[in-house]
Amino acid sequence: MYYELATMTLPFGTAAQAATAIKTYAAEPQARGELLGCWFTDIGVLNQMLVLRGFDSLADLQAERQRTQQSADPFGCGAIAQTLVQDSYQGFPWMQPVRPSAESGIHGPVYEIRTYGIKPGGVQPTIDLWAQSVPARHAVSPCVIAMVAIDGPLRFTNIWAYPSIQARTQARADAVAQGIWPPKGGPAWLTTAMTSTIALATATSPLA
């Protein structure tokens, strides 16, 4: 399964307008893929909308990326978006495809999006080590997806769902205390290029 995580910088006070426009844009007849997440940042770089879309094939992802880049009104936000970055990913092969909350049972509304740099040669070891550790960690709080970038610097992004900020803090502390997280040996393959963003589900987000 392939994914795009698009990041738009928006003027203050336009998040609701943008979320509605994004839903409409993703449902247009010519659109490829499926809208899965639409989140607005709360902690980290502010005034950013994060849009997660899923694709059955790389060809569909590339076609939709081209449609968006060539559009005069990308995501229906051309008049307000100040920046747009589209990052392409492939899900870790052992992970289930991302599904909306109504199907998966995974709910936020708080989502943490973490991106880690990977050292050369570290992609497959990272995938394998996470396969061993995520099931136990998922039982503490659900991992929505772990996915490796297919362009740009070596990196992967993982997304986690929590009912509240407090629940996130407790879940992470519990996982460390139980010795189930981070994956044993996993950090050795990572660089110090790490980011974490806390974002809240918008009213139109399938991952609510």
Predicted regions and their residues:
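Short, structured motif recognition centered on aromatic/hydrophobic residues
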Residues: Y2-T7, A18, M49-R53, P109-T115, ...
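Short acidic/polar capping segments at secondary-structure boundaries
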Residues: W94-P97, G117-V123
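Short amphipathic alpha-helical segments
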Residues: T14-L35, D60, Q66-P74, P120-I145, ...
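Short, extreme N-terminal leader segments that mark the start of a protein/domain
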Residues: Y3-L5, T9-T14, T204
